């Protein structure tokens, strides 16, 4: 017999009755019934009930003193449970083990929180004792699911002719849009490596190197604030790059991977391929977001022209000053109480709106509400047709500059859906957002900057860049840039790359970078592109967000084994931490007085 176990805790069935077995695991629960002690023994695979009887009083008394989460090895006979004690929620629920001996492999101290319940302890306490937290069923299963998803991704990608690579972790800083994690060099004093925000340049260089289809389960490091769906330190992505491809080639390659993943690991309805394509400007108009949740049936409409010559002075004057008016329908909400409309107005104001107009179209064909009296019957009919609403519906209005109005309308759209419970249940709805702006105005400097990935190919190529003379014309330029969105969550960004040095120099010069600076920051890639670079493109779906959706987790830390907390601290390993002065001296680093003060205080 094996030293620790003949079976795992999820293996024994009614067909095993009469066998002598050995099991090892953690004491999950203990119940003392006087003449009987029951222990639920748990391992990675499941739970088996162990029973100690008063026929071996000493053994039973020892079992009654076992602390939860102690590790034990038990030897005993498999017996059938009586009919009224069968537990159909357990795979092993038809049997139990009548113990004849056990060994304590490792006794547990008093637990800082309860393991055998789904009730959450404070998160920082859980993260400090993550090795205990990971024993809980839901979290344990999430980590197993993550492994299965990544394994299946590898299978899907290799089956499609992709080669898996590992790119460097110590590299140079590049402008990916977030702060770098910097690593000082001991051998090159005063110089720093950066942990990669993404393997962007390396995967493009692999295409230049003649490889055709690259993928990597890539760790990425960004020094940015935490969110519910974003870890503050590192995350993983399915990094993909392909040579000699168009945008549609990328779509048709990734769509079946996403569809296969989501249909394999969930019973929910998944969007059929091909996924719907929505240009960026259309998405901002109809949904008020470049990450639309298509489970929400509400579609925003532009009603600027209806109000341009209306008697509603506020909107009419706004339009004269360059603002727009967006209408957000509220299906079957016309008969709702005044409190519903007041609550919506309060919400809009809390989001920065000056107010929120509305009209109720009652079933007797009467329009009421604060805005209705300012519109003629013809304008009201035009409004109903434009917004696609009918009697019994209500409609809300926001008016502001185009970009702000879009975002406000998008937030109102989501809030209406929540209030009216409109969100379609038990489904994953995918879409592509395409034709992103190539440039944007930097909010701090008011200068032209890249909107997304600076390595994207502008639509129209070099001619488009040369022909755009004004700021307005530059902001109208679009890129071969795309996002894949599922249920309102951006899973990935991607692009067809700019593989021509002359276009890259021009694109960067418009954003304020000299040719010398481009060569300094991206010299390796520019140099490579001068020796024959294939047209190429790629994408990088976020592994963590995919697992979050499939695990139905609301917090990204619930699908990562050892995450940082929201303050970017590893409470288990006590990181970040201070290092000795000797190590700093070797690296040529001296702490500022404010940083030195923090060291001394701790």
Curated annotation (Swiss-Prot):
- Main site of residence? cytoplasm
Reactions accelerated catalytically = tRNA(Asx) + L-aspartate + ATP = L-aspartyl-tRNA(Asx) + AMP + diphosphate
EC number of the protein: 6.1.1.23
Region of interest: Aspartate: 200-203
This entry's Gene Ontology molecular function terms read: aspartate-tRNA ligase activity; aspartate-tRNA(Asn) ligase activity; ATP binding; nucleic acid binding
SUPFAM superfamilies per the record? Class II aaRS and biotin synthetases (SSF55681), GAD domain-like (SSF55261), Nucleic acid-binding proteins (SSF50249)
Q: State the InterPro entries in the record.
A: Aa-tRNA-synt_II, aa-tRNA-synth_II, aa-tRNA-synth_II/BPL/LPL, Asp-tRNA-ligase_1, Asp-tRNA-ligase_1_N, Asp/Asn-tRNA-synth_IIb, AspRS_core, GAD-like_sf
Class in the EC hierarchy, top level: ligase
In terms of PROSITE patterns, this protein maps to:
AA_TRNA_LIGASE_II
Q: Name one GO biological process term.
A: aspartyl-tRNA aminoacylation
What keywords is this UniProt entry annotated with? Answer: Aminoacyl-tRNA synthetase, ATP-binding, Cytoplasm, Ligase, Nucleotide-binding, Protein biosynthesis
Q: Which family does it belong to?
A: Belongs to the class-II aminoacyl-tRNA synthetase family. Type 1 subfamily.
Name of the protein? Aspartate--tRNA(Asp/Asn) ligase
- Which species does the entry assign this protein to? Rickettsia canadensis (strain McKiel)
